[in-house]
């Protein structure tokens, strides 16, 4: 059974305490609702994992936990089997006592692109919207964050996060809540808010930017990473039925257009920190994610286009500040 009591106790003593006016009731409602058909199987995998305390823990350069002496073949097999019950693993990688989870995405590459452009994270309270398995939450802690809170309604991601947390010694500096951004009140409590890989899935992208702004303290920093296309400040792609085989892609702006959107929503000091094409080395099929990946979504005769004929995925990082 995945519980959230530790998080409630934690925020009861800090500047997030007003969240307790709504959060426990929301989580209780989530627990009462019909869960995914495999949720019991996933939560059992977490429950059956051994409690581990790392002898060496590296969250600064990777997400790596090691024991003082190598685990037995039986212990490794148990951990490996239980973690494979939580496939597909999309965001990572993780190295846990000799079990290496080679995820679909090299999320460490994204972190390496983003980190140099951020304000110092030491001591900060952070929100990561659409955090997936929580890989970047651990990297935020490694970079010095005081508390990293992720939200993502996908139940498999919650179980993946709790599995990793259990193998990291039940670390309480990072937490994942099974909520969407629309379920959060205007907390105005986070020093840094991340939204990475979310904006193009939103029917109303400007509303999403306002929601992110409502979570920030004054002078807080927004880190926005999303799909973009080439063009000027008036260029926006509105795909048809699918983009790179994804049905729920609504708006893909150019980076200059996205900068203009952020300014329209009242953000200041907006800058385009990075733009790069997504490669099949960064997003690919692995033994931990065995279904289709980026290579299957690109035109086999022209890798600069998706199978639908749109420009192939490229992603931008924009940094902005709430006044």
From Swiss-Prot:
Top-level taxon in the UniProt lineage: Bacteria
Keywords in alphabetical order: Transferase, tRNA processing
Signal sequence, start to end: none
Catalytic reaction equation(s): carboxy-S-adenosyl-L-methionine + 5-hydroxyuridine(34) in tRNA = 5-carboxymethoxyuridine(34) in tRNA + S-adenosyl-L-homocysteine + H(+)
Residues given in the record as carboxy-S-adenosyl-L-methionine binding sites: 91, 105, 110, 130, 152-154, 181-182, 196, 200, 315
MF term (GO), any: transferase activity, transferring alkyl or aryl (other than methyl) groups
A Gene Ontology BP annotation from the UniProt entry: tRNA wobble uridine modification
Matches recorded under InterPro entries: CmoB, Mo5U34_MeTrfas-like, SAM-dependent_MTases_sf
Keyword field contains Thylakoid: no
EC numbers for this chain: 2.5.1.-
A UniProt-annotated Pfam family: Methyltransf_9
Function comment: Catalyzes carboxymethyl transfer from carboxy-S-adenosyl-L-methionine (Cx-SAM) to 5-hydroxyuridine (ho5U) to form 5-carboxymethoxyuridine (cmo5U) at position 34 in tRNAs.
Quaternary structure (record): Homotetramer.
Similarity-based family: Belongs to the class I-like SAM-binding methyltransferase superfamily. CmoB family.
HAMAP family: tRNA_carboxymethyltr_CmoB
Designated name of the protein: tRNA U34 carboxymethyltransferase
Organism: Salmonella paratyphi C (strain RKS4594)
